[in-house]
């Protein structure tokens, strides 16, 4: 059973009045129940928190974790798309003239990290930091992960949707992001184990050359 939150506090008894009870703290089970109806608590797992990250969490804590989940899901979806694109096509030209390194010379997947010159890595991390600190700001009071980047060209289309449709699309994004996080992790593991990251190809017997 889920443990209850801290027991109610007591004020010490006075010579002039009895002990006064404070308002009972909200139990962990009540907290859990309050999150079971949130977007993302859906089939097939429903509300699933095996690590207890939401134990005794308030709404602010939940929204922080949801923000992180949405962001990581989006990054993982981009990583999957980039991995597949890099496997099939490369940009023309040079990645680094000083290192005499062309885009065509770059390996795919995790192996690419060891080939990027230090100056290139610095640019990548600097750009990510700039986006994180100055551009991708969550809209105050909105769903976690709602960014406004120079105005939203799709705002009118989104606003015209019913609340049910918006909730459905948010749930789809969460599910796709969760699948992508597991997918890119699986590809990275299989790349390191056998240099064959595309498990579906292996299962179907579709041959490919990786790096």
From Swiss-Prot:
Function text: The light-harvesting complex (LHC) functions as a light receptor, it captures and delivers excitation energy to photosystems with which it is closely associated. Energy is transferred from the carotenoid and chlorophyll C (or B) to chlorophyll A and the photosynthetic reaction centers where it is used to synthesize ATP and reducing power.
Key word Membrane present: yes
The organelle targeting sequence, given as a residue range: 1-33
GO biological process: photosynthesis, light harvesting
Location(s), subcellular: Plastid, Chloroplast thylakoid membrane
Organism of origin: Macrocystis pyrifera
Name of the protein in question: Fucoxanthin-chlorophyll a-c binding protein F, chloroplastic
Transmembrane residue ranges: 75-95, 116-136, 177-197
One MF annotation (Gene Ontology) recorded for this entry: chlorophyll binding
Family: Belongs to the fucoxanthin chlorophyll protein family.
Triggers of expression: Levels are increased up to tenfold when transferred from high intensity to low intensity blue or white light.
Matching Gene3D superfamilies: Chlorophyll a/b binding protein domain (1.10.3460.10)
Plastid found in the keyword field: yes
Broad class of the protein's primary localization: plastid
InterPro entries: Chloro_AB-bd_pln (IPR001344), Chloroa_b-bind (IPR022796)
Keywords: Chlorophyll, Chloroplast, Chromophore, Light-harvesting polypeptide, Membrane, Photosynthesis, Photosystem II, Plastid, Thylakoid, Transit peptide, Transmembrane, Transmembrane helix
Coiled-coil residue spans: none
SUPFAM superfamilies named among the record's database cross-references: Chlorophyll a-b binding protein
């Amino acid at each position: 059973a889920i443990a209850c939150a801290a027991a109610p506090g007591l004020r010490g008894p006075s010579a002039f009045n009895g002990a006064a009870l404070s308002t009972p703290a909200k139990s962990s089970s009540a907290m859990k129940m309050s999150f079971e109806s949130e977007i993302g608590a859906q089939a097939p797992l429903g509300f699933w928190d095996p690590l207890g990250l939401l134990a005794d969490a308030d709404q602010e804590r939940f929204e922080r974790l949801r923000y992180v989940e949405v962001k990581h899901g989006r990054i993982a979806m981009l990583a999957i798309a980039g991995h597949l694109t890099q496997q099939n096509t490369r940009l023309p030209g040079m990645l680094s003239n000083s290192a005499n390194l062309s885009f065509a010379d770059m390996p795919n997947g995790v192996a690419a990290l060891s080939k990027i010159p230090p100056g290139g890595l610095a640019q990548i991390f600097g750009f990510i930091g700039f986006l994180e600190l100055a551009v991708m700001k969550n809209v105050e009071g909105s769903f976690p992960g709602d960014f406004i980047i120079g105005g939203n060209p799709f705002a009118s289309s989104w606003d015209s949707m019913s609340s049910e449709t918006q909730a459905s699309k948010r749930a789809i994004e969460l599910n796709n992001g969760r699948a992508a996080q597991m997918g890119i992790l699986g590809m990275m593991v299989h790349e390191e184990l056998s240099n064959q990251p595309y498990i579906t190809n292996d299962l179907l017997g579709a041959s490919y050359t990786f790096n």
